[in-house]
Amino acid sequence: MATLAYSIEVEGLEDETLVVRGFHGQESLSNSVFLGQACYGFRYEVQLASRVSNLTAEQMVDKRAELKLYRNSQLVQRVHGIVRAFSQGDIGHHHTFYQLTLVPALERLSLRHNSRIFQKQTVPEILSILLQEMGINDYAFALKRDGVQREFCVQYRESDIDFLHRLAAEEGLVYSFVHEAGKHTLYFSDASDSLSKLPEPIPYNALVGGAIDTPYIHGLTYRTQAEVSEVQLKDYSFKKPAYSFLQTVQGTELDYQQTRYQHFDAPGRYKDDVNGAAFSQIRLDYLRRHAHTATGQSNEPLLRAGYKFDLQEHLDPAMNRDWVVVSINHQGEQPQALQEDGGSGATTYSNQFSLIPGHLHWRAEPQPKPQVDGPMIATVVGPEGEEIFCDEHGRVKIHFPWDRYSNGNEQSSCWVRVSQGWAGSQYGFIAIPRIGHEVIVEFLNGDPDQPIITGRTYHATNTPPYTLPEHKTKTVLRTETHQGEGFNELSFEDQAGKEQIYLHAQKDFDGLIENDQFTQIKHNQHLTVEWESREAVTGEQVLSIEGSLHVKTGKVRVNEAGTEIHVKAGQKVVIEAGSEITVKAGGSFVKVDPAGVHLSGALVNLNSGGSAGSGSGFGGAMPALPGGLEPAVALAPPQTISYQALLQAEQANVPAVKVCPLAAQEATPAVNSITPPPPPPIAPPMAPPQPIMNPQPTANAQPNLGRSTKATPDFPTHFPKSSIGIENELAGLVVAMPANSAQKFGYVKSAQGDALFMLTKDMNQGSYQRPPSLQDGKNYQNWQTHTVELVSYPCEMDDKAAVETRKQAMLWLATHFTTHIDQSNHQPLAPIQSEDGRFVIEITNAKHVIAAGNGISAESQGQTITMTPSGQQATVGVAAKGFGTSATPELRLLESAPWYQKSLKSQFASLTSAENLDDKELAANVFAYLTSIYLKTAELAKKFGIYINEWDPMSEQITPNANGLTDPKVKNAWEILPRTKPSKIVEILSKSDAKAVMKHIKPQLQSRYSESLSKNVFQYFQDGGEVAGHGINNATVGDKHSPELAILFEFRTVPNELQSYLPKTESTTKSEVKLLDQFDPMKRKTVIQQVESLV
């Protein structure tokens, strides 16, 4: 039978000073808890005895020590560490009892607490700094994944050991220890493959008992439990605002459990796909670390946390495999150490352990990240000699007062974003904090690694522009000249009687007014120009002065007119000169000088009759006054709504207000009391019911075709969210266009409000649809659809009479429907006649939208939005001719679309500054438009799962367009791609310009999206792929009868599998008569009745 023995050595003591009575210890992969105390890899409580009775803490605490285990006098295991705690117990006749706690040197980091900043360093580099600062040089990394530099990593009010554990857990690192003579090495790994393995397998012995010389394992229990099956993380980066950063990782070995246990978290604490994928897998490994575990016992001292071993001789062959020791408890007793004091019994050793299968990776428990519980003060810093230091995003560097390690320069922090009062696409407000400014810093989600500047403050050194409180009534915007003296200022004085707006420009003042300027001065105006003053007016200039006009020049005054100068006075005109006055006309003149009056001409007539010449006279218009301020509107008093009106609102499914029980009792006698109907289901908010002002429509109701006197408004950028599956992906006008014809009938002038669609199909029917409240475009099953079919009469587009008839019929139908919508307490649509003879439908705040599927076209301004009869399609486009110098109207609308990135034009100009392009402006416009399409396609492909990289259109004989994407061979294909061929767009460029445009598109994709996605999107278009819609507006190049080229960008929001849930239009009447017959009064009355019964 094997004999066991234990001994211990402590730095500075003789080897035989202490004898081991017993020990109890725990080891674990990374940190754990042992006997209520933190265990940083290992922790042993060792019971000792010594003949020396006066050992002190100075001799023991913080000293190196080594516990050794012997079998048959051979050293088989050692535990090296430092003494964390030492205690003295009873004093006997021969021995004094002691106890010490043996821990790794790593535990020293738990005694340091700090706040500091690390920049552009990997986690292994940061951990190395922490260890080396504590004099720990025995450490090693065995990592499968390359460390990624962290731009900004903050240790914030936490101990060094907590900081180390937090970073290690985030990166999936675990640590264990390798014990050697005189040292223990801290060993970091991120995969089970990197762990050390015992050289010999360990046998399993199910029948404990008898004398067995070799160590063995017994009591092994294997446990499987259901855990999280999928992890999904999400984050955001301002550098890629449209990119979702969504990462999904599915677990493996899930046959025994359901796969619906998803763990979602945001933010995921990553800013790129590489880290996102790694962090998601690490999170899943941690959440599933208890899915497959085993526990057991043994007498093998070689078993240690962080080691692998092979098990053999188990009755279940599946258990004879490799295992990883996750944690293990060791117990040893050595009574013979006190033999002289009566100690007896055999020396024993045993352990209890926890395992995972060798192919799995153990992950440490993520440590909570310190939260910054409020704003901080910091100072803006930068290089010496600079006043303003920022990057292309307007970010600055800052220094925190608590940061003891930085020098207060440009290396003190990462680039920190600055909150601005208004931030749009190349518009808004920008004020860069300057070096030395004090700023208020907050942290996104309380994360110390994500600071953002949200405010600025004055202090004792940086004082306000004007002293306070003397100038407390001033509101001031004052800047300071960069690298010079002076300032610009706009200030407002609000002291009663001293109100003033003050504007100061240190150098130049430039102004540009694109249209009119109206200025009114109700008292004096003084203008002093110390150098030149020039004024140019291309039209007329009128100067009207009720008093006197005095003009004085120091030298010469010249008045020159192309046709006439007319001088007129009510009483007299005096022209005075010191030496000479000359009046000259043609070859004749009158000259007055000190020598006399000289008349010269072909003929001089005196009192010869005739009449004097006349001038044009004053004909200028008086200046217009500027618009006044709108007076404040008083709040309207509370409105009482009758119970009958509330009932009407309920029947119309229009939320109003809750019915008052007292009002209900007053409105209805108690004998015939009516229980108010239950409130309607939650729906998009609508206007409360109002008294119906419009009369019922008559059989002779005709559309209002009067000439519009309203100025054309700016086209809004609101698109109905409730009926589109993609939220806010498209903004613009709600319009319809002819799907297969060149005929243009009109356009929707403006549209606002959450719209429910009223559509017409093939110009033959009107469909009133009332969708329910939708959630992300889902729940299409419950649409309520009512349809009135007029005729099934075809109309050729080249039949002008038939086209005109259909237009009038659709106009009448629209008018009739809008009247009914108004009766449901909604603002009506007002068809009016446009200047070019086409009708216009204005939608100013309606809850419904009318469109004629083949009857209304958005030719105006080049903007096109299409609604198909099922309400699932929307298209926006711009005329191809709109690119270039004459593109202002079209591009103005195009640039309002959220997917269009206007800044790409200036980027292209910068990228091609050294290239000789034939038409730089046209190329920049094409580049911006195409790149916007490429980027939007990549974004939607990533967001909605368009797998354009999983199929080859050519090999499958599928046309690469939206119809091809609906092919069953394409997986999960949402039809959300723009339809147009880049080759058609670049045809308007020269070959060299087209080549330059295409060359610079791909890097734009790669800078925002993954390499694979960028490659596939780019290749898709290069292979001739077009994207949803009607091609290039069904235009045939070179055909003079073909419609004008229009480049379309279409979104289809209903996937194929949801088509069956769309509303089914049911006709209430069918007729084979021509449209013209519908204007027959009797038939018109029939249709009206049908509409009324439905609506």
UniProtKB/Swiss-Prot annotation:
GO terms for cellular component: extracellular region; host cell cytosol. Mg(2+) 1 binds at E727, Q873, E1050. Keywords: ATP-binding, Host cytoplasm, Ligase, Magnesium, Metal-binding, Nucleotide-binding, Secreted, Toxin, Virulence. InterPro entries: ACD_dom, Gp5/Vgr_OB, Gp5_Vgr_C, T6SS_RhsGE_Vgr_subset, T6SS_Vgr_RhsGE, T6SS_VgrG/RHS, Vgr_OB-fold_dom_sf. Its cofactor is Mg(2+). Residues 712-1095 form the ACD domain. ATP binds at S723, I724, G725, I726, E727, S792, R979. It is found in: Secreted; Host cytoplasm, Host cytosol. Mg(2+) 2 binds at E727, E789. It is an enzyme of class 6 (ligase). Belongs to the VgrG protein family. Interacts with protein VC1417. This is Actin cross-linking toxin VgrG1. The gene is vgrG1.
